[in-house]
Design a protein with these regions (language model features):
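Basic, helix-initiating cap at the start of DNA-binding domains
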Residues: 1-34, 38-47, 58, 63-64
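Amphipathic, non-transmembrane alpha-helical scaffold segments
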Residues: 16, 20, 24, 70, ...
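Key DNA-contact positions within bacterial/archaeal DNA-binding proteins
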Residues: 53
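Amphipathic alpha-helical linker/stalk segments
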Residues: 67-98, 106, 110
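Helical hydrophobic small-molecule/effector-binding pocket
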Residues: 93-120, 124, 174-177
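Amphipathic alpha-helical packing segments from all-alpha helical-bundle domains
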Residues: 109, 113, 117, 126-153, ...
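Hydrophobic/aromatic-rich alpha-helical bundle segments in the mid-to-C-terminal region
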Residues: 152-201
Length: 208
């Protein structure tokens, strides 16, 4: 005769990482859709379907939560070069792929919403803006600078100030389109075709 095992009572345990991600997702959507003032811990807990005391297991206060959300949004995306370039044509192709990946992340509807939020006036804004710039802009620029330097060492590029070139290239592809998207002049990706800007940016590296 088969044994009847009693079913465990209560809800199944949800992994903490799942809860944390749910909190971050809810907070991010509240921030970009309703702004800072309406992104309260009470509202986050309600939208996430958790008790407020559960929320406090993951965050100290609202400022800590916002910092976590901004940093996790950026840290989830680490652009990189997938293949080694063996000639100048491959170098240019790899660079275009790299810039396309950055643009798809940095010019998405969510990214534009976050950028608009950070341009508004609210408590803790300066600290969040600083962390956003360090995480997003500096990370991409440093990766690109190091990669271009390595291509120079391989003889694929002429000598130039790769730090400034990296800054210029990323600014051409991201900075001005992001400003126009935040103002509503351009739609976010994928509605806007960023390819012409990428082509213009990589032309800075073309050999004479």
């Amino acid at each position: 005769m088969a044994e009847n095992h009693p079913r465990p009572r209560g809800r199944p345990t949800i992994p903490e990482q799942v809860i944390r991600q749910k909190i971050h997702d809810v907070t991010f959507l509240l921030l970009i859709n309703q702004g800072y003032n309406k992104t309260t811990l009470d509202e986050v807990a309600k939208k996430a379907g958790i008790a407020k005391k559960t929320l406090y297991r993951f965050v100290k206060n609202r400022e800590d939560l916002l910092e976590q959300v901004v940093m996790s949004w950026e840290d989830n995306f680490i652009p990189d070069f997938k293949k080694e370039a063996n000639n100048f044509q491959q170098l240019m192709k790899s660079l275009k792929i790299f810039l396309t990946e950055i643009a798809e992340k940095s010019l998405s509807m969510e990214a534009v919403g976050l950028f608009k939020l950070l341009q508004s006036d609210f408590p803790y804004r300066e600290i969040l803006l600083s962390k956003y710039q360090q995480s997003e802009i500096e990370k991409s620029r440093n990766i690109l600078t190091n990669w271009l330097e390595s291509q120079y060492q391989k003889g694929l590029l002429k000598k130039m100030d790769f730090y400034i070139i990296s800054e210029l290239v990323i600014s051409m592809v991201i900075a001005e389109p992001l400003r126009q998207m935040a103002l509503g002049i351009l739609p976010s990706l994928p509605e806007t075709d960023i390819t012409p800007r990428i082509s213009a940016a990589v032309s800075l590296l073309e050999r004479e």
